[in-house]
Amino acid sequence: MTTFRELGLSDSLLQSVESMGFEEATPIQAETIPHALQGKDIIGQAQTGTGKTAAFGLPLLDKVDTHKESVQGIVIAPTRELAIQVGEELYKIGKHKRVRILPIYGGQDINRQIRALKKHPHIIVGTPGRILDHINRKTLRLQNVETVVLDEADEMLNMGFIEDIEAILTDVPETHQTLLFSATMPDPIRRIAERFMTEPQHIKVKAKEVTMPNIQQFYLEVQEKKKFDVLTRLLDIQSPELAIVFGRTKRRVDELSEALNLRGYAAEGIHGDLTQAKRMSVLRKFKEGSIEVLVATDVAARGLDISGVTHVYNFDIPQDPESYVHRIGRTGRAGKKGIAMLFVTPRESGQLKNIERTTKRKMDRMDAPTLDEALEGQQRLIAEKLQNTIENENLAYYKRIAEEMLEENDSVTVVAAALKMMTKEPDTTPIALTSEPPVVARGGGSKKRGGNGGGYRDGNRNRSRDGRGGDGRNRDRNRDGRNRDGNRDRNRDGGNRGRRGEGQGRPGSSNGRGERKHHSRKPQA
């Protein structure tokens, strides 16, 4: 293994890294940092959880001249949660060097951001829409930027941000260094690399398994209309400490979180339509344990850094295998065990195979529990806890009352009563969820999700992003945009499913009038 001291980093950064408890670099860090410190462009292919933030963050921070009062680096991330997380990580790493980091994203007061920009941050971490908004307002100037980082570029493609990224890249000096990180390399991302990067070093970290071995993965074949009852039975049997349930759309998240509360579970949902304050409030309650189930869309959960998640339930199978990897990566962290459950409807078996091919791992099948099995499962879990208490706790204070009870009742009856009191009785509250269409795998895979991102610029970007899938089908995630003050960053998942194809620009057009705009670093042939 390579230590950070062997990578040629400055003393102030080494001090920060060591104070954070890190000594050895991960493979992506060991391969990326030396090339990046030399000023080379980098294409890094690595999954989440490989340490890629430090892989680009350390050389980015190393290059910053803190005596200059100008923006010297920008990191572009697909979601506000990831922007916040990356900003926090860079702050920790750059603390001893006193690098000023500023996250900017939609949903936050733009005037507050403008005031912060006037304090001359060295590095900006933000979502594409809000960065571009500040560029257009002349509140963010990039003439001194030396390094641009594109984090999770494939996800930004899926969310329709490609044109925004191109516009940002044309606004920075041509001599800038680009560090592009992406789990996959679809053609539009390759074209970005060809146009805006110079002889990039391609670094790919291969893993025998894409997903972590300490995550137990199961799938259950369940009919759409029976999924909710199966979910509640699993929650009763498994009694997770903290659980995340993934739904495919905002409507699903809203309905599912409400239904769980009706059945007596402490649950709340997060998705793109919630205000930033509301989302942060929900996450805080989840981290504190005042809610036990977090229901989320893929995009809303991107970048979440929550420790202690024991179970992930994929209530809806994801549109693409990469999203599955990101979903289950919320559990099984820091050496702890995690459990991931995937609900598969009869027509989704092909998508299950796609996921298994991507993860290079066969999932174990689990039968959906019946009502009787759910009750018995609860009782066995309670019995285990009772046995653990018998073996490890001091019970002297409780024995006198126990002995009095045994004088009047036999021991089996007493234990049975205790089990009954601690068992959650079946709740038959009627629940009606709106059915979601199945994800049917086509052509042996599901990675093709919509070309170059399409869409409009010049004020027309706020139209619906429904139906972007190339095959004319509604993509179910519905990336409907919002206004140009950056709030469209808020709503990249779910919503308004009926407006398929509305507001679609011609492929390659950028202003709603069919005029093509080329933003290329290379001379046009």
Swiss-Prot record:
Residues 515-525 have a biased composition (Basic residues). Keywords: ATP-binding, Cytoplasm, Helicase, Hydrolase, Nucleotide-binding, RNA-binding, Stress response. GO terms for biological process: response to cold; RNA catabolic process. A motif (Q motif) lies at residues 2-30. Residues 458-503 have a biased composition (Basic and acidic residues). It catalyses: ATP + H2O = ADP + phosphate + H(+). A motif (DEAD box) lies at residues 151-154. It holds the Pfam family Helicase_C. Gene3D superfamilies: P-loop containing nucleotide triphosphate hydrolases. Residues 428-525 are annotated as: Disordered. GO terms for molecular function: ATP binding; ATP hydrolysis activity; RNA binding; RNA helicase activity; RNA strand annealing activity. Its main location: cytoplasm. Its EC number is 3.6.4.13. Residues 33-203 form the Helicase ATP-binding domain. HAMAP family: DEAD_helicase_CshA. DEAD-box RNA helicase possibly involved in RNA degradation. Unwinds dsRNA in both 5'- and 3'-directions, has RNA-dependent ATPase activity. This is DEAD-box ATP-dependent RNA helicase CshA. The lineage of its organism: Bacteria, Bacillati, Bacillota, Bacilli, Bacillales.
